[in-house]
A protein has these predicted regions:
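Replace the tail clause
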Residues: 41-51
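Conserved non-cysteine loop/helix-boundary elements of the Radical SAM core domain that shape
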Residues: 8-34, 51, 55-166, 170-196
Length: 196
């Protein structure tokens, strides 16, 4: 993964979303407000917003920071400042710019019943996870820090909790071959715990 001291791990400073974040000093309110303004300036409606919070393993951030960050995102959509995430979410139900989907990134080894409840409390509707590979040997060689079984267990739990799911898979990782990648990709569609 690329490492840029200005960005969360795996993100480059010249990606559009990363550039916007840096331009606004990573302030969640300013990022959302400027993005909404840009959409509206280009003639798009911002009545329904899907908010993607990118930048690594969301679950590894302190929970008070998570609440603050999302509250400020919702404050930008609501057009007023809330004292709590609960208030911000409640106001957003009637706001002119309603959030219709909140996407958070995490890792399979961070998913457990407590984390699932917490993500629901924050209003999360979709979870993105980096599987990267379905081969434990390749994952060990790339120091992923979790196993295929942990990925399967996380997907089963998240699906049972009603989350929409996005799974990132990467071909050509260290230790993989064209043939092993083909087999790996086929497992994405044949494994009942992983397939859409």
């Amino acid at each position: 993964c690329p490492t840029d001291v200005r960005m969360p791990k795996s993100y480059l400073h010249d990606e559009p979303g990363a550039m916007r974040a840096e331009q606004h000093g990573f302030d969640p309110f300013e990022q959302v407000a400027s993005r909404v303004d840009a959409f509206e300036a280009n003639g798009h409606t911002a009545e329904k917003i899907e908010l993607l919070v990118l930048g690594g393993t969301w679950s590894s951030y302190p929970r008070d920071y998570q609440e603050h960050f999302l509250r400020r995102c919702f404050d930008a959509m609501n057009g007023r400042d809330a004292a709590s995430i609960d208030r911000a979410l409640a106001w957003n139900e009637q706001a002119a710019r309603r959030n219709v989907g909140l996407v958070l990134e995490t890792r399979p080894d961070h998913v457990d019943p407590d984390e699932i409840r917490w993500m629901r409390h924050l209003g999360c509707t979709k979870v993105q996870m980096g599987a990267q590979s379905l081969d434990d040997r390749v994952m060990r060689m790339n120091r992923r820090g979790h196993t295929v079984q942990q990925l399967r267990d996380a997907m089963i739990q998240l699906r049972a909790a009603g989350f929409k799911l996005v799974l990132h898979w990467m071909p050509n990782l260290h230790g993989a071959t064209i043939e092993s990648d083909r087999e790996d990709f086929a497992r994405l569609w044949s494994d009942p715990a992983l397939r859409p």
